Amino acid sequence: MEGVLAANWSAEAVNSSAAPPEAEGNRTAGPPQRNEALARVEVAVLCLILFLALSGNACVLLALRTTRHKHSRLFFFMKHLSIADLVVAVFQVLPQLLWDITFRFYGPDLLCRLVKYLQVVGMFASTYLLLLMSLDRCLAICQPLRALRRPADRLAVLATWLGCLVASAPQVHIFSLREVADGVFDCWAVFIQPWGPKAYITWITLAVYIVPVIVLAACYGLISFKIWQNLRLKTAAEAAEAIAGTEGAAAGSRGRAALARVSSVKLISKAKIRTVKMTFIIVLAFIVCWTPFFFVQMWSVWDADAPKEASAFIIAMLLASLNSCCNPWIYMLFTGHLFHELVQRFLCCSSSHLKTSRPGETSVSKKSNSSTFVLSQHSSSQKSCS
Protein backbone atom coordinates (compact mmCIF):
# COMPACT_ATOMS: atom_id res chain seq x y z
CA MET A 1 0.00 0.00 0.00
CA GLU A 2 1.22 3.51 -0.78
CA GLY A 3 2.56 5.86 1.81
CA VAL A 4 5.01 3.60 3.64
CA LEU A 5 7.81 5.83 4.96
CA ALA A 6 11.22 4.27 5.15
CA ALA A 7 14.17 4.66 7.54
CA ASN A 8 11.88 4.16 10.53
CA TRP A 9 11.05 7.85 10.91
CA SER A 10 7.47 6.58 10.66
CA ALA A 11 7.93 5.98 14.38
CA GLU A 12 7.52 9.72 14.96
CA ALA A 13 4.56 10.86 17.02
CA VAL A 14 2.41 11.84 14.04
CA ASN A 15 3.03 9.12 11.53
CA SER A 16 1.93 9.57 7.97
CA SER A 17 2.62 5.98 7.00
CA ALA A 18 -0.19 3.79 5.78
CA ALA A 19 -0.83 0.15 6.44
CA PRO A 20 2.03 -2.32 5.84
CA PRO A 21 2.38 -3.96 2.46
CA GLU A 22 -0.36 -6.48 1.87
CA ALA A 23 0.52 -7.70 -1.57
CA GLU A 24 2.02 -11.15 -1.54
CA GLY A 25 4.94 -9.93 -3.59
CA ASN A 26 5.82 -7.44 -0.91
CA ARG A 27 5.49 -10.06 1.81
CA THR A 28 7.95 -12.43 0.15
CA ALA A 29 10.42 -9.68 -0.66
CA GLY A 30 11.32 -9.35 2.99
CA PRO A 31 11.10 -6.40 5.36
CA PRO A 32 12.28 -2.97 4.18
CA GLN A 33 15.79 -1.98 5.13
CA ARG A 34 17.17 1.30 6.47
CA ASN A 35 20.22 3.50 6.17
CA GLU A 36 22.36 2.39 9.12
CA ALA A 37 24.65 5.44 8.97
CA LEU A 38 21.66 7.76 9.14
CA ALA A 39 20.17 5.66 11.94
CA ARG A 40 23.34 6.15 14.00
CA VAL A 41 23.07 9.92 13.51
CA GLU A 42 19.43 9.78 14.64
CA VAL A 43 20.39 7.83 17.75
CA ALA A 44 23.15 10.30 18.65
CA VAL A 45 20.89 13.33 18.14
CA LEU A 46 18.05 11.79 20.14
CA CYS A 47 20.41 10.85 23.00
CA LEU A 48 21.58 14.45 23.22
CA ILE A 49 18.02 15.81 23.06
CA LEU A 50 16.84 13.36 25.72
CA PHE A 51 19.67 14.26 28.11
CA LEU A 52 19.19 18.01 27.69
CA ALA A 53 15.40 17.83 27.99
CA LEU A 54 15.43 15.64 31.11
CA SER A 55 18.20 17.49 32.94
CA GLY A 56 17.07 20.99 31.95
CA ASN A 57 13.40 20.60 32.81
CA ALA A 58 14.17 18.69 36.01
CA CYS A 59 16.36 21.61 37.12
CA VAL A 60 13.55 24.05 36.29
CA LEU A 61 11.03 22.11 38.39
CA LEU A 62 13.50 21.81 41.27
CA ALA A 63 14.29 25.53 41.12
CA LEU A 64 10.60 26.42 41.07
CA ARG A 65 10.00 24.17 44.06
CA THR A 66 12.75 25.79 46.17
CA THR A 67 12.16 29.43 45.23
CA ARG A 68 10.59 31.91 47.62
CA HIS A 69 8.20 33.10 44.89
CA LYS A 70 6.26 29.87 44.51
CA HIS A 71 2.94 31.65 44.06
CA SER A 72 4.06 33.71 41.07
CA ARG A 73 1.58 33.51 38.22
CA LEU A 74 4.33 33.14 35.60
CA PHE A 75 6.11 30.42 37.59
CA PHE A 76 2.85 28.47 37.80
CA PHE A 77 2.65 28.27 34.00
CA MET A 78 6.39 27.63 33.70
CA LYS A 79 5.97 24.61 35.98
CA HIS A 80 3.29 23.02 33.83
CA LEU A 81 5.12 23.79 30.60
CA SER A 82 8.21 22.07 32.03
CA ILE A 83 6.07 19.06 32.98
CA ALA A 84 4.77 18.94 29.41
CA ASP A 85 8.34 19.07 28.09
CA LEU A 86 9.24 16.17 30.38
CA VAL A 87 6.29 14.24 28.96
CA VAL A 88 7.70 14.88 25.49
CA ALA A 89 11.14 13.67 26.59
CA VAL A 90 9.95 10.51 28.35
CA PHE A 91 7.07 9.44 26.11
CA GLN A 92 8.13 10.79 22.72
CA VAL A 93 11.91 11.13 22.52
CA LEU A 94 12.78 8.04 24.59
CA PRO A 95 10.49 5.61 22.68
CA GLN A 96 11.75 7.03 19.39
CA LEU A 97 15.34 6.53 20.56
CA LEU A 98 14.70 2.91 21.51
CA TRP A 99 12.86 2.38 18.24
CA ASP A 100 15.78 3.73 16.22
CA ILE A 101 18.12 1.37 18.07
CA THR A 102 15.99 -1.75 17.49
CA PHE A 103 14.58 -0.69 14.09
CA ARG A 104 11.41 -2.70 14.82
CA PHE A 105 8.87 -2.29 17.60
CA TYR A 106 9.27 -5.11 20.13
CA GLY A 107 6.22 -5.18 22.33
CA PRO A 108 2.53 -6.11 22.46
CA ASP A 109 -0.20 -4.33 20.57
CA LEU A 110 -1.37 -2.52 23.72
CA LEU A 111 2.08 -1.01 24.25
CA CYS A 112 2.21 0.08 20.60
CA ARG A 113 -1.07 1.97 20.93
CA LEU A 114 -0.12 3.43 24.33
CA VAL A 115 3.25 4.74 23.10
CA LYS A 116 1.68 6.39 20.06
CA TYR A 117 -1.04 7.93 22.22
CA LEU A 118 1.38 9.38 24.78
CA GLN A 119 3.66 10.75 22.06
CA VAL A 120 0.88 12.99 20.77
CA VAL A 121 -0.31 13.89 24.29
CA GLY A 122 3.08 15.50 24.93
CA MET A 123 2.95 17.32 21.60
CA PHE A 124 -0.50 18.78 22.31
CA ALA A 125 0.30 19.63 25.94
CA SER A 126 3.55 21.44 25.15
CA THR A 127 1.81 23.52 22.49
CA TYR A 128 -1.35 24.48 24.35
CA LEU A 129 0.31 25.19 27.69
CA LEU A 130 2.61 27.60 25.84
CA LEU A 131 -0.50 29.13 24.29
CA LEU A 132 -2.09 29.42 27.74
CA MET A 133 1.01 31.14 29.16
CA SER A 134 1.02 33.61 26.26
CA LEU A 135 -2.67 34.40 26.79
CA ASP A 136 -1.92 35.05 30.46
CA ARG A 137 0.89 37.46 29.54
CA CYS A 138 -1.43 39.20 27.10
CA LEU A 139 -4.03 39.71 29.83
CA ALA A 140 -1.32 40.87 32.25
CA ILE A 141 -0.30 43.61 29.81
CA CYS A 142 -3.73 44.57 28.48
CA GLN A 143 -5.47 44.35 31.87
CA PRO A 144 -2.78 45.15 34.46
CA LEU A 145 -5.30 45.61 37.28
CA ARG A 146 -6.79 42.16 36.77
CA ALA A 147 -6.82 40.31 40.10
CA LEU A 148 -4.83 37.14 40.57
CA ARG A 149 -7.29 34.29 40.40
CA ARG A 150 -5.43 31.11 41.23
CA PRO A 151 -8.48 28.78 41.02
CA ALA A 152 -9.20 30.07 37.50
CA ASP A 153 -5.58 29.45 36.48
CA ARG A 154 -5.66 25.92 37.84
CA LEU A 155 -8.95 25.23 36.12
CA ALA A 156 -7.56 26.47 32.80
CA VAL A 157 -4.46 24.27 33.12
CA LEU A 158 -6.56 21.25 34.11
CA ALA A 159 -8.89 21.81 31.15
CA THR A 160 -5.86 22.06 28.85
CA TRP A 161 -4.43 18.74 30.05
CA LEU A 162 -7.82 17.02 29.72
CA GLY A 163 -8.30 18.47 26.25
CA CYS A 164 -4.88 17.15 25.18
CA LEU A 165 -5.75 13.67 26.46
CA VAL A 166 -8.99 13.68 24.47
CA ALA A 167 -7.48 15.16 21.28
CA SER A 168 -4.82 12.42 21.21
CA ALA A 169 -7.37 9.58 21.34
CA PRO A 170 -7.41 8.91 17.53
CA GLN A 171 -3.84 7.60 17.80
CA VAL A 172 -5.15 4.54 19.69
CA HIS A 173 -7.38 3.60 16.75
CA ILE A 174 -4.95 4.46 13.96
CA PHE A 175 -1.89 2.59 15.23
CA SER A 176 -1.59 -1.12 15.91
CA LEU A 177 0.94 -3.94 15.82
CA ARG A 178 0.83 -5.34 12.28
CA GLU A 179 2.80 -7.78 10.16
CA VAL A 180 4.94 -5.83 7.69
CA ALA A 181 6.66 -8.89 6.21
CA ASP A 182 6.67 -12.63 6.75
CA GLY A 183 7.11 -13.03 10.51
CA VAL A 184 8.09 -9.36 10.97
CA PHE A 185 5.80 -7.14 13.06
CA ASP A 186 5.92 -3.40 13.62
CA CYS A 187 3.79 -0.59 15.02
CA TRP A 188 2.07 0.84 11.95
CA ALA A 189 -0.67 3.31 11.12
CA VAL A 190 -3.67 2.29 9.04
CA PHE A 191 -5.52 4.95 7.05
CA ILE A 192 -8.37 4.89 4.57
CA GLN A 193 -6.73 5.46 1.21
CA PRO A 194 -6.17 7.81 -0.49
CA TRP A 195 -7.60 10.64 1.62
CA GLY A 196 -6.99 9.26 5.14
CA PRO A 197 -3.34 10.32 5.58
CA LYS A 198 -3.99 13.74 4.08
CA ALA A 199 -6.98 14.40 6.33
CA TYR A 200 -5.27 13.27 9.53
CA ILE A 201 -1.93 15.01 9.01
CA THR A 202 -3.68 18.20 7.91
CA TRP A 203 -5.84 18.12 11.04
CA ILE A 204 -2.79 17.58 13.29
CA THR A 205 -0.96 20.43 11.55
CA LEU A 206 -3.91 22.77 12.00
CA ALA A 207 -4.50 21.79 15.65
CA VAL A 208 -0.90 21.73 16.87
CA TYR A 209 0.80 24.31 14.67
CA ILE A 210 -1.21 26.64 12.43
CA VAL A 211 -4.08 27.61 14.77
CA PRO A 212 -1.78 28.07 17.83
CA VAL A 213 0.64 30.19 15.79
CA ILE A 214 -2.23 32.42 14.62
CA VAL A 215 -3.47 32.88 18.20
CA LEU A 216 0.07 33.53 19.44
CA ALA A 217 0.58 36.13 16.72
CA ALA A 218 -2.66 37.85 17.76
CA CYS A 219 -1.58 37.83 21.42
CA TYR A 220 1.77 39.44 20.75
CA GLY A 221 0.20 41.88 18.32
CA LEU A 222 -2.06 43.09 21.14
CA ILE A 223 0.87 43.16 23.55
CA SER A 224 2.95 45.24 21.14
CA PHE A 225 0.06 47.68 20.62
CA LYS A 226 -0.46 48.06 24.37
CA ILE A 227 3.25 48.67 25.00
CA TRP A 228 3.27 51.26 22.21
CA GLN A 229 0.30 52.97 23.88
CA ASN A 230 2.13 53.01 27.21
CA LEU A 231 5.26 54.47 25.65
CA ARG A 232 3.22 57.17 23.91
CA LEU A 233 1.49 58.04 27.19
CA LYS A 234 4.85 58.17 28.92
CA THR A 235 6.25 60.53 26.29
CA ALA A 236 3.19 62.79 26.50
CA ALA A 237 3.37 62.86 30.30
CA GLU A 238 7.06 63.80 30.24
CA ALA A 239 6.29 66.64 27.82
CA ALA A 240 3.49 67.88 30.09
CA GLU A 241 5.84 67.79 33.06
CA ALA A 242 8.42 69.87 31.21
CA ILE A 243 5.79 72.46 30.26
CA ALA A 244 4.50 72.58 33.83
CA GLY A 245 7.99 73.32 35.08
CA THR A 246 8.21 76.46 32.94
CA GLU A 247 4.70 77.84 33.65
CA GLY A 248 5.04 78.41 37.39
CA ALA A 249 3.01 77.31 40.39
CA ALA A 250 -0.35 77.49 38.59
CA ALA A 251 0.59 74.49 36.47
CA GLY A 252 2.40 72.69 39.29
CA SER A 253 -0.49 70.40 40.07
CA ARG A 254 -0.74 69.35 36.42
CA GLY A 255 2.97 68.63 36.40
CA ARG A 256 2.71 66.45 39.48
CA ALA A 257 -0.20 64.57 37.89
CA ALA A 258 1.85 64.04 34.77
CA LEU A 259 4.74 62.76 36.87
CA ALA A 260 2.40 60.29 38.55
CA ARG A 261 1.30 58.99 35.17
CA VAL A 262 4.92 58.64 34.08
CA SER A 263 5.75 56.62 37.19
CA SER A 264 2.71 54.41 36.59
CA VAL A 265 3.77 53.65 33.03
CA LYS A 266 7.32 52.89 34.16
CA LEU A 267 6.01 50.51 36.80
CA ILE A 268 3.91 48.56 34.26
CA SER A 269 6.81 48.31 31.83
CA LYS A 270 9.37 47.12 34.36
CA ALA A 271 7.02 44.61 35.95
CA LYS A 272 5.77 43.00 32.74
CA ILE A 273 8.13 43.59 29.84
CA ARG A 274 10.74 41.04 30.92
CA THR A 275 8.21 38.21 31.19
CA VAL A 276 6.75 39.21 27.83
CA LYS A 277 10.21 39.01 26.28
CA MET A 278 10.72 35.55 27.77
CA THR A 279 7.45 34.13 26.46
CA PHE A 280 8.07 35.74 23.07
CA ILE A 281 11.46 33.99 22.79
CA ILE A 282 9.80 30.69 23.80
CA VAL A 283 7.23 31.20 21.03
CA LEU A 284 9.99 31.90 18.50
CA ALA A 285 11.77 28.70 19.56
CA PHE A 286 8.49 26.80 19.15
CA ILE A 287 8.03 28.10 15.61
CA VAL A 288 11.64 27.46 14.59
CA CYS A 289 11.65 23.89 15.94
CA TRP A 290 8.22 22.79 14.75
CA THR A 291 8.10 24.40 11.29
CA PRO A 292 10.41 21.83 9.59
CA PHE A 293 8.51 18.95 11.20
CA PHE A 294 5.09 19.99 9.96
CA PHE A 295 6.47 21.12 6.61
CA VAL A 296 7.86 17.66 5.80
CA GLN A 297 4.75 15.97 7.22
CA MET A 298 2.47 17.93 4.91
CA TRP A 299 4.86 17.50 2.00
CA SER A 300 4.98 13.73 2.48
CA VAL A 301 1.20 13.26 2.30
CA TRP A 302 0.32 15.85 -0.34
CA ASP A 303 3.19 15.13 -2.76
CA ALA A 304 3.55 11.54 -3.97
CA ASP A 305 7.09 12.32 -5.18
CA ALA A 306 8.34 13.75 -1.87
CA PRO A 307 11.90 12.55 -1.01
CA LYS A 308 10.81 10.64 2.08
CA GLU A 309 14.11 8.78 2.38
CA ALA A 310 16.37 11.83 2.02
CA SER A 311 18.64 12.54 4.98
CA ALA A 312 17.56 16.19 5.27
CA PHE A 313 13.92 15.10 5.15
CA ILE A 314 14.41 12.71 8.06
CA ILE A 315 16.62 14.96 10.20
CA ALA A 316 14.01 17.72 9.90
CA MET A 317 11.63 15.41 11.73
CA LEU A 318 13.97 15.34 14.72
CA LEU A 319 14.15 19.12 15.14
CA ALA A 320 10.71 19.30 16.75
CA SER A 321 11.99 17.61 19.91
CA LEU A 322 14.63 20.34 20.30
CA ASN A 323 11.89 22.63 21.56
CA SER A 324 11.65 20.69 24.83
CA CYS A 325 15.34 21.22 25.63
CA CYS A 326 15.43 24.87 24.48
CA ASN A 327 12.85 26.10 26.97
CA PRO A 328 14.94 25.55 30.15
CA TRP A 329 17.78 27.64 28.70
CA ILE A 330 15.33 30.43 27.91
CA TYR A 331 14.04 30.28 31.49
CA MET A 332 17.63 30.49 32.73
CA LEU A 333 18.30 33.53 30.54
CA PHE A 334 15.35 35.54 31.83
CA THR A 335 14.93 34.18 35.38
CA GLY A 336 18.53 33.45 36.28
CA HIS A 337 17.90 34.18 39.96
CA LEU A 338 15.93 30.92 40.17
CA PHE A 339 18.94 28.83 39.25
CA HIS A 340 21.27 31.03 41.28
CA GLU A 341 19.17 30.35 44.38
CA LEU A 342 19.08 26.63 43.55
CA VAL A 343 22.88 26.43 43.24
CA GLN A 344 23.36 28.41 46.44
CA ARG A 345 20.98 26.15 48.33
CA PHE A 346 22.74 23.05 47.02
CA LEU A 347 26.20 24.36 47.91
CA CYS A 348 25.03 25.57 51.30
CA CYS A 349 23.39 22.28 52.20
CA SER A 350 26.45 20.37 50.96
CA SER A 351 28.70 22.51 53.14
CA SER A 352 26.37 22.02 56.10
CA HIS A 353 26.48 18.27 55.55
CA LEU A 354 30.28 18.32 55.50
CA LYS A 355 30.37 20.22 58.80
CA THR A 356 28.08 17.72 60.50
CA SER A 357 29.85 14.68 59.05
CA ARG A 358 33.35 15.93 60.05
CA PRO A 359 33.13 17.30 63.59
CA GLY A 360 36.91 17.21 63.98
CA GLU A 361 37.42 19.61 61.07
CA THR A 362 34.99 22.34 62.06
CA SER A 363 37.38 25.25 61.53
CA VAL A 364 38.38 24.06 58.05
CA SER A 365 34.75 23.57 57.02
CA LYS A 366 33.81 26.98 58.37
CA LYS A 367 36.58 28.61 56.38
CA SER A 368 35.53 26.81 53.22
CA ASN A 369 31.93 27.83 53.76
CA SER A 370 32.79 31.51 54.21
CA SER A 371 34.93 31.59 51.08
CA THR A 372 32.30 29.78 49.04
CA PHE A 373 29.57 32.30 49.90
CA VAL A 374 31.68 35.44 50.03
CA LEU A 375 29.69 36.91 47.13
CA SER A 376 26.26 36.16 48.59
CA GLN A 377 26.65 35.97 52.33
CA HIS A 378 23.24 37.57 52.95
CA SER A 379 21.20 35.22 50.77
CA SER A 380 18.07 33.68 52.19
CA SER A 381 19.03 30.22 50.96
CA GLN A 382 22.20 30.33 53.07
CA LYS A 383 20.25 31.33 56.15
CA SER A 384 17.80 28.50 55.71
CA CYS A 385 20.54 25.91 55.57
CA SER A 386 22.79 27.27 58.33
UniProtKB/Swiss-Prot annotation:
Keyword RNA-binding: no
Region annotation Disordered: where it falls in the sequence: 1-31, 355-386
Membrane-side (Cytoplasmic) residue stretches: 64-74, 136-154, 226-277, 335-386
Listed Pfam families: 7tm_1
Disulfide bonds: C112-C187
UniProt topological domain (Extracellular) ranges: 1-38, 98-113, 176-202, 297-311
Polar residues bias locations: 355-375
Keyword set, alphabetical order: Cell membrane, Disulfide bond, G-protein coupled receptor, Glycoprotein, Membrane, Phosphoprotein, Receptor, Transducer, Transmembrane, Transmembrane helix
Keyword Disulfide bond: yes
Gene Ontology terms for molecular function: oxytocin receptor activity; vasopressin receptor activity
Modified residues (Phosphoserine): S368, S370
GO biological process: cellular response to hormone stimulus; female pregnancy; G protein-coupled receptor signaling pathway; maternal process involved in parturition; positive regulation of vasoconstriction; regulation of systemic arterial blood pressure by vasopressin
Sequence ranges of Low complexity compositional bias: 376-386
Glycosylation sites: N8, N15, N26
Compartments in which it is found: Cell membrane
Bilayer disposition of the protein: Multi-pass membrane protein
Superkingdom in the source lineage: Eukaryota
GO CC terms: plasma membrane
Transmembrane residue ranges: 39-63, 75-97, 114-135, 155-175, 203-225, 278-296, 312-334
Family, per entry: Belongs to the G-protein coupled receptor 1 family. Vasopressin/oxytocin receptor subfamily.
Role description: Receptor for oxytocin. The activity of this receptor is mediated by G proteins which activate a phosphatidylinositol-calcium second messenger system.
Protein name (database record): Oxytocin receptor
Gene: OXTR
